[in-house]
Regions:
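Short, Lys/Arg-rich amphipathic alpha-helical interaction segments
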Residues: 92-129
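Pre-recognition alpha-helix immediately N-terminal to the DNA-recognition helix
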Residues: 84-85
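General nucleic-acid-binding
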Residues: 1-58
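Charged, low-complexity, helix-prone segments enriched in Lys/Glu/Asp/Gln
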Residues: 17-25, 73-81, 118
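Amphipathic alpha-helical interaction segments
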Residues: 42-45, 66-69, 98
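Short alpha-helical segment immediately N-terminal to, or the first helix within
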Residues: 88-89
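Short, Lys/Arg-enriched anionic-surface-contact patches
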Residues: 3-10, 59-81, 128
Length: 129
């Protein structure tokens, strides 16, 4: 029960952070062609926006706090992208040695282990949702 309450609290904080960054100007950014319909910008894109604003403006601290709040969501997005890329690479017939070289890993075994860790994190997050 405590985990569920903490998850709901984090989700509410992330929603508030997204709203704050959209109000701070992220809503007017051009849409990436791969974002269909009403899909919002990624947490990573919103963090990049906050960093850009902080480097170019005297930005309100709430923008920086909102970006910090989105760091766990951005990490989750990167995990999902990494898992999807590795699935895609294997589906396209790429070998583990080639995948490991592309990712800068020491061996095929390291790539397989990383795949297991990343997909495990993604699945754990889905199970918590």
């Amino acid at each position: 029960m405590e985990n569920s309450d903490a998850d709901h609290g984090q989700a509410a904080r992330e929603a508030d952070a997204r709203r704050r960054l959209m109000e701070a100007g992220a809503a007017s950014l051009p849409r990436a062609p791969w974002l269909h319909g009403g899909r919002p910008p990624s947490a990573a894109d919103l963090i990049d926006f906050a960093l850009w604003r902080a480097g170019n403006d005297d930005v309100d601290e709430s923008v920086v706090m909102a970006a910090l709040t989105l760091l766990p969501a951005a990490r989750a997005e990167v995990d999902q992208a990494e898992a999807a890329l590795m699935f895609t690479a294997r589906a396209r017939g790429l070998s583990w040695p080639r995948i490991s070289r592309a990712m800068g890993l020491a061996s095929a075994q390291a790539a397989q282990q990383r795949f297991g860790r990343v997909t495990g994190r993604v699945e754990n997050r889905r199970g918590e949702a």
